[in-house]
Amino acid sequence: MSLLRSLRFFPVACTGRSARAVLLQPSQPWHTLHAGPSLSSSASSKELLMKLRRTTGYSFVNCKKALETCGGDLKQAEAWLHKQAQKEGWSKAAKLHGRKTKEGLIGLLQEENTAVLVEVNCETDFVSRNVKFQQLVQQVALGTMAHCQNLTDQLSTYSKGFLNSSELSELAAGPDGEGSLKDQLALAIGTLGENMSLKRAAWVKVPSGFYVGSYVHGEMQSPSLQNLVLGKYGALVICQTPEQITNLEEVGRRLGQHVVGMAPLSVGSLDDEPGGETETRMLPQPYLLDPSITLGQYVQPQGVTVVDFVRFECGEGEQVAEAE
C-alpha cells in the first residue's frame, strides 16, 4: 500500500508529551577475556556479581572480570565495564565506517511548548526494530530536547532550529546517559554490530498563542520508551491560535498527517490558486483526507493559521544519492 493510501485509510496516531530516558545498556560487547585472579566464592561476592549484572546489563563473565580487576569495588567495576564497552564500540565503529546506513528511525518527542524530531540511521530494518537501537534514538531525542530547552531566548514568536550530524554528536546524552551522544553511538555500534549514524535533528519552541501539531507514520510501539514516538516519517506543524480551540490536538495531527503524505515544500497562502496533485505549496494542495477541497479550505474554519512545518523521511538523503 502506498504512503498516501495508507495515510488516508488508517487512523492518526496520538503522540505523548513527555519521556524519561532509558539508558542504552550493551548486553555483551566483547568476547575475549584474559585470565585473572578469581573472586571469592562467598555469598557477598555473589551478591556483588548479581548486583553489577542487574545494574549494567553486561554478561556475567564480563561482570566477574570487572570485579576481579577492581578488587571487588562495585563502583570501580561498573566504570571499568563502561570503559571496556566504549573501547570495543569505537574499535568496531572504525571497522564499519563507510558502510551505508539507509535504514533507521525517526523519533518524535514533545514536552510542553517544545517538540523535536530526530533521525538515526542503521544498515538494516532488523536492527531498527531492536530495543537497544530504539533506546539510542531516545537518547538523541532527549539530548536534543535538553539542548533546545537550555536556549534562553525570550520568545515573542516561534523558534525553529536544526542540528546536523556533527552537531548532534557533541550533545550530552539524555539525563541518565553518560558522556556525549557520539559515545552512546559507539556503544550501540559495539553492541549491535552494524554501522550507525546520527543524521539530523529539528526542534521547535513556541510561546503562548502558538501550537505544534505532530504526526509520525509507520509508528512502532515500545513500552520501555514511554511517550517517545518512533516511525519512518515524521512532521511538526506550527500553528498560530489566537483563541482557545477545543479540537486543536486533532487539527494538529491532521495537519502533520497531510505534511507527511503530501510532502509540501512551502506553506503558501490562503489566496493561492489550487495547483492540483503537483502543487508543492501546502495550503493550496488537495487536502490529504478529502481531496475535493484544499488544505487551506480545511484549515480556515478551524480558527488556526499555519505558519511553518518540518518534515523528516527516514533515509531520504541516501535514497536520492542512490537514484543519482
From Swiss-Prot:
Keywords: Elongation factor, Mitochondrion, Phosphoprotein, Protein biosynthesis, Transit peptide. The modification Phosphoserine is found at S269. Its main location: mitochondrion. Residues 1-44 form a transit peptide. GO terms for biological process: mitochondrial translational elongation; regulation of mitochondrial translation. InterPro entries: EF-Ts_dimer_sf (IPR036402), Transl_elong_EFTs/EF1B (IPR001816), Transl_elong_EFTs/EF1B_dimer (IPR014039), Transl_elong_Ts_CS (IPR018101), UBA-like_sf (IPR009060). PROSITE patterns: EF_TS_1 (PS01126), EF_TS_2 (PS01127). Pfam families: EF-Ts_N, EF_TS. HAMAP family: EF_Ts. Associates with the EF-Tu.GDP complex and induces the exchange of GDP to GTP. It remains bound to the aminoacyl-tRNA.EF-Tu.GTP complex up to the GTP hydrolysis stage on the ribosome. This is Elongation factor Ts, mitochondrial.
